[in-house]
């Protein structure tokens, strides 16, 4: 999607990707090999004017090595923090960004100390390699913690208090090389088995106070890293306050709605930021519902029978829980967007949350 956004700007792309025949190879040149292959990294640097990443499992060491030869954005330091939940939590604390109570777990003695600091119910999360709900275990009673840690392979982890949040939001901001910052509207996210299924943009019922909190914490993070590119911050709303859950230093699934519902998509703005070009408009052009396609591809004709639907398929091999594409339903009328979303959900056998009003997810 980055390459598709860059093509009209005259940009050409080379991808480093281990899987042969990846869908990205349709829109650029693919180097097939491991993300830490020194020879391929050297070739990528030689072939590129600048390098970015859209996958958090890229080794930070590879990004740092590339940065010695050509500009890399977002900064490798942000990638390192985004890959480690403990570093992430410590960073939130250092910037006085509210977050859930947590404790480090790295030894048997830490298990006892963690239960003194974090009330149950809590969630044990591996420090690294957690994505779409992986690397987590729910702890309902204190006696379950050791078993949960064994379940995670005794990997370094954090124990985090379960937050009784009202909803999950995402704040997406982009910062250019010259320091220019632009922010998209806050969006509301809904998950299915730990995987993002639905994003509503803008988030229904936003208040100036919520928008101000999101802008302040995003600005603190962007400044902390001297950031370049798109940064997503996943947030919990709790009684009018925002708690930071995690950062994603890359273009983000909850920003895919911008392809059809914003004046400039997150993908184009990410590229503009890295190139030092002026940023595009980030305001929404109406109301958008983004529905992820999981596990099985739909009939394109059925999806596109909805007048405001935009179908984006990724040409990936279907498997359970895999994101195969997404549909954006975008328009100026929140009732029409809601009606078409409900029709799409019925066609795909997707369970949707109940709308705030009988006929609309947004106030009318």
PLM regions: where:
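Active-site "cap" helix and flanking loop/linker of ATP-utilizing ligase/carboxylase catalytic domains
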Residues: 212-233, 238-239, 248-296
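Short, low-complexity Ser/Thr-rich regulatory SLiMs
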Residues: 173-177, 235-239, 315
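Peripheral (often C-terminal) accessory segments that flank ATP-dependent C-N-forming ligase machineries
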Residues: 271-364
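Active-site nucleotide/adenylate-binding loops and adjacent lid/helix of ATP-dependent enzymes
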Residues: 81-170, 174-221, 331, 345
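Anion (oxyanion) recognition and catalysis
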Residues: 7, 45, 66-67, 93, ...
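ATP-binding N-terminal substructure of ATP-dependent carboxylate-amine bond-forming enzymes
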Residues: 1-87, 109
């Amino acid at each position: 999607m980055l390459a598709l956004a860059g093509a009209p700007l005259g940009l050409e792309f080379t991808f480093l990707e281990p899987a042969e025949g990846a869908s990205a190879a349709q829109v650029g040149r693919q180097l097939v090999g491991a993300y830490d292959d020194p020879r391929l990294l050297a070739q990528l640097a030689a072939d590129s004017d600048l390098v970015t990443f859209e996958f958090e499992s890229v080794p930070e060491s590879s990004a740092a090595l590339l940065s010695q030869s050509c500009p890399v954005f977002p900064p490798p330091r942000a990638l390192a923090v985004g890959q480690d939940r403990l570093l992430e939590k410590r960073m939130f604390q250092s910037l006085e960004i509210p977050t859930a109570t947590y404790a480090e777990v790295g030894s048997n003695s830490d298990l006892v100390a963690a239960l003194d600091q974090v009330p149950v119910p809590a969630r044990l999360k591996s420090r690294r390699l957690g994505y779409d709900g992986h690397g987590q275990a729910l702890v309902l009673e204190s006696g379950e913690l050791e078993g949960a840690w064994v379940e995670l392979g005794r990997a370094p982890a954090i124990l985090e208090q379960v937050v009784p949040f009202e909803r999950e939001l995402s704040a997406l901001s982009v910062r250019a090389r010259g320091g220019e910052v632009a922010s998209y509207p806050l969006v509301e996210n809904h998950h299915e088995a730990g995987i993002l299924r639905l994003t509503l943009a803008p988030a229904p019922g936003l208040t100036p106070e919520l928008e101000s909190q999101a802008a302040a914490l995003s600005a603190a993070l962007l400044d902390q890293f001297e950031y370049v590119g798109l940064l997503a911050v996943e947030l919990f709303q709790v009684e009018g306050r925002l708690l930071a859950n995690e950062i994603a230093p890359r273009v983000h699934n909850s920003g895919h709605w911008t392809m059809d519902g914003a004046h400039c998509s997150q993908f184009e703005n990410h590229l503009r930021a890295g190139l030092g070009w002026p940023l595009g408009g980030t305001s929404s052009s109406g109301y958008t519902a983004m529905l992820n396609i999981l596990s099985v591809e739909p009939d394109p004709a059925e999806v596109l029978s909805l007048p405001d639907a935009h179908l984006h398929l990724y040409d990936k091999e279907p498997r359970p829980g895999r994101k195969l594409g997404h549909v954006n339903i975008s328009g100026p009328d929140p009732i029409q967007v809601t009606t078409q979303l409900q029709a799409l959900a019925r066609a795909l056998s997707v369970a949707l949350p109940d709308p705030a009003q009988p006929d609309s997810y947004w106030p009318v």
